[in-house]
């Protein structure tokens, strides 16, 4: 528990099982670009870890790798990550927003269970599997953006105990009925939007910005840090992440 910061040498290629489990004093973490995998329970219970940026070499995050990192507020996943293991970020209730890169194909069971501070979630169309209870207990969610033209099959427990009456589910244009008739239909507010920019953000040509909103739907006068939703004069809506 006395370890507060950690910088690993470039010779390290993987973080083994439970290597830093229980290092409750660890607040900052720098991983070298040589690391390709973070194994199960690697940072389990590192309750003081605040921000986490993984190098672009990491492809997999093991089961319970960051479970119980209750101070984790900022999470940046690189476009190399393809798999998020079971309970990988379970109980990280300080995590506020999450945009998964378009490389992710699998989200394990209970991966983000109990992340009650999570307000905004963006799921790319690359995801082909979401495990049971993956987002159970994410009671703070106010917006979810998906871009599957055909709803991905999910278990009834996937969003259990989320505020499905308040949270807005944004789906691609022309897919409202399909989502409403699937397990995604638990969300009372389903809104269609232009999902073309959800995986690859592009500029909107000659179109001009006409309005901007925060992830919770609040109108913004100027760009704000985090996820911004921008409406353009040609009718398109784009997701923009402001650093």
Indicate residue ranges for each PLM-predicted region.
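A recurrent domain-boundary module in secreted/ectodomain proteins
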Residues: 180-197
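Residue-level detector of functionally pivotal "anchor" positions at catalytic/ligand-binding pockets or at interdomain
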Residues: 193-212, 216
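Generic structural signal for well-ordered beta-strand positions
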Residues: 220-221, 238
């Amino acid at each position: 528990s006395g370890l507060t910061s950690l910088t690993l040498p470039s010779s390290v290629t993987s973080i083994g099982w439970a290597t830093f489990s229980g290092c409750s004093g660890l607040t900052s973490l720098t991983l070298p670009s040589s690391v390709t995998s973070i194994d199960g329970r690697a940072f389990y219970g590192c309750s003081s870890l605040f921000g986490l940026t993984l190098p672009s070499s990491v492809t997999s995050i093991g089961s319970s790798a960051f479970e119980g990192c209750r101070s984790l507020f900022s999470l940046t996943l690189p476009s190399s990550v393809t798999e998020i293991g079971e309970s990988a970020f379970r109980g990280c209730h300080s995590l506020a927003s999450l945009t998964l890169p378009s490389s992710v194909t699998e989200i394990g069971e209970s991966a983000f269970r109990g992340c009650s501070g999570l307000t905004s979630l963006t799921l790319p169309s690359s995801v082909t599997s979401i495990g049971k209870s993956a987002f159970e207990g994410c009671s703070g969610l106010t917006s979810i953006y998906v871009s599957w033209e055909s709803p991905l099959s999910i278990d009834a427990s996937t969003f259990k105990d989320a505020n499905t009456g308040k949270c807005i589910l944004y789906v691609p244009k022309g897919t409202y009925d399909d989502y409403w008739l699937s397990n995604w239909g638990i969300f009372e507010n389903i809104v269609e939007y232009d999902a073309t920019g959800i995986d690859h953000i592009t500029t909107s040509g000659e179109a001009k910005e006409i309005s901007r909103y925060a992830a919770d739907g609040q109108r913004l006068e100027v760009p704000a840090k985090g996820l911004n939703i921008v409406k353009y004069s040609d009718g398109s809506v784009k997701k923009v992440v402001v650093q």
